[in-house]
């Protein structure tokens, strides 16, 4: 833990002092709404989060951590790699306590392509796509099939201090007989000051074989510099059949140039 903390401090210092862009870092966390902004060309960006999620069946999920790494391949396209190390704690009545399963979820690879810039009422639009690779997971989390997902991510600037982000997309599952779910998110964001940001959000999943699942969340973020950011968020399910009971998450993001620009 001491070495991990020291590494974070070194990264924080280096990206704060040595690498500066005039724009603040744009991240896909902490909300469920992905950002339409891509990483600058020849820059690397990492977004790391830790989360605790409770569902209504009594199962707890611990993400420790989930990590999204990005690289700006061009002005309009970024490569993306998602890894998630997770533990599930299920409520069972045994003398030793609850049953816990820990491991790596299937690694996701993909990209983000900037499609349109914001113009009057037209939002800034990008396309994000991933696929999960079955055999890259720990044995207990491996799936038979590749698992794709995509979403269009959009954002309108309502004023200097308020923006509106929203996503529409689909995600598939590892079982052939399961139909894909439609994804939606809707998140107004507020620039509270030069360094503070807050958001509120509604998001959900619609599947032909299941009841709609709708949830709300909110959070805050603080920019230490243009290239470093921390965030805190939480949310809960709002419909009867939503599996999510509540969650809380904490994250840290940074970016730095891979080559001189």
Regions found by a protein language model. Name each.
Residues 20-261:
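Transmembrane beta-barrel domains of Gram-negative outer membranes and organellar outer membranes
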Residues 1-23:
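Bacterial Sec-dependent N-terminal signal peptides
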């Amino acid at each position: 833990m001491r070495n991990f903390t020291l590494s974070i401090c070194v990264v924080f210092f280096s990206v704060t002092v040595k690498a500066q862009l005039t724009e603040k870092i744009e991240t896909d966390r902490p909300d469920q709404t992905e950002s339409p902004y891509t990483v600058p060309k020849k820059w690397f960006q990492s977004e790391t989060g830790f989360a605790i999620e409770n569902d209504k069946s009594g199962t707890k999920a611990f993400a420790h951590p989930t990590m999204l790494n990005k690289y700006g391949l061009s002005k309009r396209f970024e490569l993306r790699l998602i890894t998630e190390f997770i533990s599930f704690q299920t409520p069972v009545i045994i003398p030793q306590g609850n049953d816990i399963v820990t491991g790596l979820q299937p690694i996701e690879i993909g990209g983000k392509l900037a499609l349109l810039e914001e113009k009057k009422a037209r939002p800034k639009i990008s396309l994000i796509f991933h696929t999960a690779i079955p055999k890259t997971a720990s044995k207990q989390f491996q799936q038979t099939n590749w698992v794709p997902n995509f979403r269009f991510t959009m954002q309108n600037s309502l004023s200097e201090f308020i923006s509106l982000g929203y996503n529409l997309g689909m995600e598939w599952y590892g079982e052939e007989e399961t139909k894909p779910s439609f994804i939606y998110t809707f998140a107004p964001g507020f620039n509270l000051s030069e360094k503070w940001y807050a958001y509120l959000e509604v998001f959900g999943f619609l599947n032909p074989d299941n009841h709609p699942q709708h949830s709300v969340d909110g959070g805050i973020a603080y920019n230490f510099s243009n290239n470093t950011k921390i965030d805190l968020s939480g949310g809960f399910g709002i419909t009867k059949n939503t599996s999510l009971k509540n969650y809380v998450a904490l994250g840290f993001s940074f970016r730095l140039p891979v080559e001189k620009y």
